Amino acid sequence: MSACGRKALTLLSSVFAVCGLGLLGIAVSTDYWLYLEEGVIVPQNQSTEIKMSLHSGLWRVCFLAGEERGRCFTIEYVMPMNTQLTSESTVNVLKMIRSATPFPLVSLFFMFIGFILNNIGHIRPHRTILAFVSGIFFILSGLSLVVGLVLYISSINDEMLNRTKDAETYFNYKYGWSFAFAAISFLLTESAGVMSVYLFMKRYTAEDMYRPHPGFYRPRLSNCSDYSGQFLHPDAWVRGRSPSDISSEASLQMNSNYPALLKCPDYDQMSSSPC
């Protein structure tokens, strides 16, 4: 991958992370996940008379029609809900969606951590591991969010299946824009996570490709003597001695092996090397 493509992918992952975090924050804090309508069907003209209409989020229920029109109530997660405000079907729906509430919160927490690590990785590009860690957090955030969305949908569908149908009653529901924001956030978060992990793999592969072999740092002068490359290998010397001792030992070795070095066939043609 070229440097231009890598920069574009990095920028795109950052934009997806910011948009996903913003959309999920809006979705969690707003009250437009679900719209519910209840009423009766007039037998004469088969028209529908709306008795109650509301929209709900993860924390509140706001009424659009009925006796409590214009009022909002906090969803009680510990104490049982007041069944006098709505019908039994609506209360059961609001009770069952409680099981899905913790997952968007966990997803928002993971997404925030991934966003912070992603920004730190862009500020300090040599920390390539941060791109991988942020990608993992983004993927975990998306998985937690999709589990919450599936539980939210299944809770409503289960109540609709168990509800006794009556020809004279009207019950309708639809998902709101807060739910749509959460679903879009899932797609953006997963995309940002996959791109972050992909960038880490590309950077890691590039570092290994351009890293020289360790043998390149230890060339030998020639093959005619076992001691010809020793002076280029500091790790071959015995450690714990002073530089003067090392220099003296090297001089003694050169003097003791000088007759053997004269046997090198190229010695007469070389003036700067003993071989």
From Swiss-Prot:
**Record membrane topology:** Multi-pass membrane protein
Q: Give the location in the cell.
A: Membrane; Postsynaptic density membrane
Membrane-spanning intervals of the chain: 8-28, 103-123, 129-149, 176-196
The UniProt entry's GO CC annotations, sorted and at most eight, read: AMPA glutamate receptor complex; glutamatergic synapse; postsynaptic density; postsynaptic density membrane
Q: InterPro entries given for it? A: CACNG_subunit (IPR051072), PMP22/EMP/MP20/Claudin (IPR004031), VDCC_g5su (IPR008369), VDCC_gsu (IPR008368)
The biological processes this protein is annotated with in GO are:
positive regulation of synaptic transmission, glutamatergic; postsynaptic neurotransmitter receptor diffusion trapping; regulation of AMPA receptor activity; transmission of nerve impulse
Its domain of life reads: Eukaryota
Gene Ontology molecular function: channel regulator activity; monoatomic ion transmembrane transporter activity; voltage-gated calcium channel activity
Report keywords, A-Z: Cell membrane, Membrane, Postsynaptic cell membrane, Synapse, Transmembrane, Transmembrane helix
Which PANTHER family does this UniProt record tie to the protein? Answer: VOLTAGE-DEPENDENT CALCIUM CHANNEL GAMMA SUBUNIT, VOLTAGE-DEPENDENT CALCIUM CHANNEL GAMMA-5 SUBUNIT
Listed under subunit, the entry gives:
The L-type calcium channel is composed of five subunits: alpha-1, alpha-2/delta, beta and gamma. Acts as an auxiliary subunit for AMPA-selective glutamate receptors (AMPARs). Found in a complex with GRIA1, GRIA2, GRIA3, GRIA4, CNIH2, CNIH3, CACNG2, CACNG3, CACNG4, CACNG7 and CACNG8. Interacts with GRIA1, GRIA2, GRIA3 and GRIA4.
Family assignment from sequence similarity: Belongs to the PMP-22/EMP/MP20 family. CACNG subfamily.
Describe the function of this protein.
Regulates the gating properties of AMPA-selective glutamate receptors (AMPARs). Modulates their gating properties by accelerating their rates of activation, deactivation and desensitization. Displays subunit-specific AMPA receptor regulation. Shows specificity for GRIA1, GRIA4 and the long isoform of GRIA2. Thought to stabilize the calcium channel in an inactivated (closed) state.
- Specify the protein name: Voltage-dependent calcium channel gamma-5 subunit
Instruction: Give the originating organism.
Output: Homo sapiens
